[in-house]
C-alpha cells in the first residue's frame, strides 16, 4: 500500500520533471550547438589540414624528384670520382714503377761507375809504375847508347885505320906485280897474247866457272896473297856487320889484284883492239844492283867503295901506260903486222871479256841489273867504278 502511496506522490510533481527535462533539452541543445560549431570548425580545420597535407604531399613529391635528381647526379659524380681515383692510382703506380726502374738504373750506373773509377785508378797506378820503370829503362838505354857510341866511334876509327893499311899493302903489291910484268921480256908477252887468243876462240863458259874461288885465287896468282889473314876482325857488336861483309871485301880486293895483273898483260894491245872490246862491253855489260837499287847499303860502306874505285882508276892508268908502249911486232913487215894486229884484237877482246866476267862476279854478290847499252846512266855508273869506255868512230 505504501507503494501505491509513493506513486501518487510522484504523479503529483510533473512540472518539476518537465522543467528538468526542458533544462536537460536546453543543455543538450546548447551542447549540441557547441559540439556542432566545434565539429564545423574541426571540419574546416580538417579541410585545411587536408589541403596542407596535399600541398605537403605535392611538395614532398617535388622534393623526392629533386632528391632523386640529386641522387642521380651524386651517383654520377661518385662514379666519375671513382674513375678519377682509379686513373690516378694507375698513373701513380706507373710513375712509381718508372721511378723505381730509374732508381735501379741510376744505382746500377753508380755502382758500375764506382767500379770503373776503381779500375781506372788501379790502371793509373799500374801505368805510373810502368812509366817510372820505362823512365829508368830510358835512362839506362841512354847511358848504354852513349857508351856504345863511344865504343862504335873507337872501333870505326880502328877499322878505318886497318882498311887504310890494307889498301896501302894492296897498292904496294899491285905496283910490285905491275913492275914485274913490265920488266918481263917481250917473248913472254907474245906467248901470253897467243894463249889469250886461243882462250878467246874457245866457247865462253858460265859465269860461275870463270870467277875463281877464294881458295884457287892465291894458288893461281902467287903474286897477290890472300888478304883475309891481314885484316883483323873488328867488333861485330859495335859495327853491326856480318862476317859475310869481310869475305866480300877480301874477294873484291883479290879481284882487283887479278884485274891489275890482266891489265899489265893486255897493256901492249893496239887501240883498235880496245875499241872492239869496248863495243862488246857495251853489248854485254851488266851493272851491280848495289849501285842503283841499294844506295843505302852502299852508303854504309863508303871506305870499301872508295877503295874499289881507286883500284879501278889505278888499273885504268896502268892499262893506258901499257897501251902507250911500243909493240915489238911493229918492226916486222906489213903482212906480219896485220896478222899480229888481228891476234892482239882477239887477245884484247878476251881480256875485256874477263874484265866483264870479274864485274859480273862482283855484281852477283849484290844483285844484277841490266842497264840499256849506251845510256847516260850506264856511262855515269861506269865512270864511278873507274871503267873508261872509248867512243866509237
Curated annotation (Swiss-Prot):
The chain crosses the membrane at residues 13-35. Its main location: Golgi. Residues 330-339 have a biased composition (Acidic residues). It is found in: Golgi apparatus, cis-Golgi network membrane. It comes from the Eukaryota. Induction: Up-regulated in response to viral infection. One of its GO terms (biological process) is nucleus organization. Gene3D superfamilies: 1.10.287.1490. GO terms for cellular component: Golgi apparatus; membrane. Residues 36-393 are lumenal. Residues 192-201, 227-247 have a biased composition (Polar residues). Glycosylated. Phosphorylation sites are present in the extracellular medium. Keywords: Acetylation, Coiled coil, Glycoprotein, Golgi apparatus, Membrane, Phosphoprotein, Signal-anchor, Transmembrane, Transmembrane helix. Glycans are attached at residues 109, 144, 227. Residues 1-12 are cytoplasmic. The modification N-acetylmethionine is found at residue 1. Belongs to the GOLM family. Unknown. Cellular response protein to viral infection. This is Golgi membrane protein 1.
Amino acid at each position: 500500500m505504501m507503494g501505491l502511496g509513493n506513486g501518487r506522490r510522484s504523479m503529483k510533481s510533473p512540472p518539476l520533471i518537465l522543467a528538468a527535462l526542458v533544462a536537460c533539452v536546453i543543455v543538450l541543445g546548447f551542447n549540441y550547438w557547441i559540439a556542432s560549431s566545434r565539429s564545423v570548425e574541426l571540419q574546416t580545420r580538417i579541410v585545411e589540414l587536408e589541403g596542407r597535407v596535399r600541398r605537403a604531399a605535392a611538395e614532398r613529391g617535388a622534393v623526392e624528384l629533386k632528391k632523386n635528381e640529386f641522387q642521380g647526379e651524386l651517383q654520377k659524380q661518385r662514379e666519375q670520382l671513382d674513375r678519377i681515383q682509379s686513373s690516378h692510382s694507375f698513373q701513380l703506380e706507373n710513375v712509381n714503377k718508372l721511378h723505381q726502374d730509374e732508381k735501379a738504373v741510376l744505382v746500377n750506373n753508380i755502382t758500375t761507375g764506382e767500379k770503373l773509377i776503381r779500375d781506372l785508378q788501379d790502371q793509373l797506378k799500374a801505368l805510373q809504375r810502368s812509366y817510372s820503370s820505362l823512365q829508368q829503362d830510358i835512362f839506362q838505354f841512354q847511358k848504354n847508347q852513349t857508351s856504345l857510341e863511344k865504343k862504335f866511334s873507337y872501333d870505326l876509327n880502328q877499322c878505318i885505320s886497318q882498311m887504310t893499311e890494307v889498301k896501302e899493302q894492296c897498292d904496294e903489291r899491285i905496283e910490285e906485280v905491275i913492275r914485274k910484268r913490265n920488266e918481263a921480256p917481250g917473248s913472254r908477252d907474245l906467248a901470253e897474247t897467243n894463249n889469250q887468243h886461243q882462250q878467246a876462240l874457245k866457247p865462253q863458259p858460265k859465269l860461275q866457272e870463270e870467277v875463281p874461288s877464294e881458295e884457287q885465287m892465291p894458288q893461281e896468282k902467287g903474286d897477290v896473297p890472300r888478304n883475309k889473314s891481314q885484316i883483323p876482325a873488328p867488333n861485330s857488336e859495335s859495327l853491326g856487320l856480318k862476317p859475310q861483309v869481310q869475305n866480300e871485301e877480301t874477294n873484291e880486293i883479290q879481284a882487283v889484284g887479278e884485274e891489275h895483273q890482266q891489265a899489265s898483260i893486255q897493256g901492249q894491245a893496239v887501240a883498235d883492239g880496245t875499241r872492239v872490246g869496248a863495243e862488246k862491253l857495251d853489248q854485254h855489260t851488266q851493272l851491280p844492283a848495289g849501285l842503283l837499287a841499294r844506295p843505302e847499303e852502299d852508303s854504309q860502306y863508303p871506305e870499301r867503295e872508295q877503295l874499289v874505285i881507286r883500284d879501278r882508276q889505278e888499273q885504268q892508268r896502268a892499262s893506258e901506260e901499257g897501251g902507250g908502249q911500243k909493240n915489238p911486232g911493229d918492226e916486222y913487215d906489213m903482212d906480219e903486222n896485220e896478222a899480229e894486229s888481228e891476234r892482239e884484237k882477239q887477245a884484247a877482246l878476251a881480256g875485256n871479256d874477263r874484265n866483264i866476267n870479274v864485274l859480273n862476279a862482283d855484281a852477283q854478290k849484290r844483285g844484277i841489273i841490266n842497264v840499256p847499252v849506251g845510256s847516260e846512266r850506264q856511262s855515269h855508273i861506269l865512270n864511278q867504278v873507274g871503267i873508261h869506255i872509248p867512243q866509237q868512230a
